[in-house]
Amino acid sequence: ITRENLKQFDGIFFYTTGMLLPDGDPREALMDFIKAGKGFVGTHSAADTFKKYQGYVSMINGSFAGHPWGGGSTNGFLNHEPNHPTVAMLGKEFIWKDEIYQYNNFDPNAVRVLFSLDMAKSKPQMPYHVPVCWVRNFGKGRVFFTNLGHNGSTWDNETYHKHLIEGFKWSLKLTDGPAEPNPELQAKESIKAFALFASQKMKLDHDKLLKDMMTKAGDEKFIKLLRENSWKSKGRDMNLIKAVLTELK
């Protein structure tokens, strides 16, 4: 990748891993390419690429932090934007067999999450929200990322082909679809994951807990605590879970 070579392209696709490019201008050239109005599409391990280069991590908005949902697992997904061209082919809810990442360095205020794990239909169940596909504006450019793409069966699936092709088209500005961040939706998804986990582990009334927690969906301090503690707990440290519940009293 060089600045001169990039001039011939309108977009770039990453299904990659590792550091790829040397320090300095090649990396900056890639970021400037997108910011200038070009398209970026990343699948699966694109979020396990350039993990030590903050410019890329910030652009894609996440870095690999494990995959509790391995390639042999079949999980449920919630499509939050069924009218968005990049995910319209998937329906409001769907089941898929693939390896699903969880992420460090994910900023809910930076991206529009299009679909997420449905913890009620996934194993293991974790107390935190796991985004799977998102879009964003990056400078004048567009970024589309989907975590799907580990399994060969995914690449053989015609629905996935449509998903990816529409991602390319959207990133190249050939179709329209919103990219404004949706942190409010993500906060509610965080609450839903936590309430499901806590009610099962601590034998609480799920519906009441969910209702009580939803009253605090707009409380930034509470949502920050919820996200931090649920992530740090890894579904094991119940003291961190209890600390969140204490804030409801």
State where each predicted segment sits.
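A glycine-rich, often tryptophan-bearing local segment used as a flexible ligand/cofactor-contacting loop or short
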Residues: 14, 19-89
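Catalytic beta-strand/loop cores that center a nucleophilic Ser/Cys/Thr
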Residues: 62, 67-140
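Structural detector of well-ordered beta-strand residues that form the stable sheet scaffold
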Residues: 39-41, 114, 144
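Solvent-exposed, acidic/flexible segments
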Residues: 19-27, 157, 161, 234-238
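Extracellular ligand-binding/catalytic regions of CAZymes and related secreted enzymes
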Residues: 121-130, 137-209, 215, 223-224
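Short acidic/histidine-rich motifs immediately flanking catalytic phosphotransfer sites
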Residues: 5-12
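Alpha-helical adaptor scaffolds
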Residues: 225-248
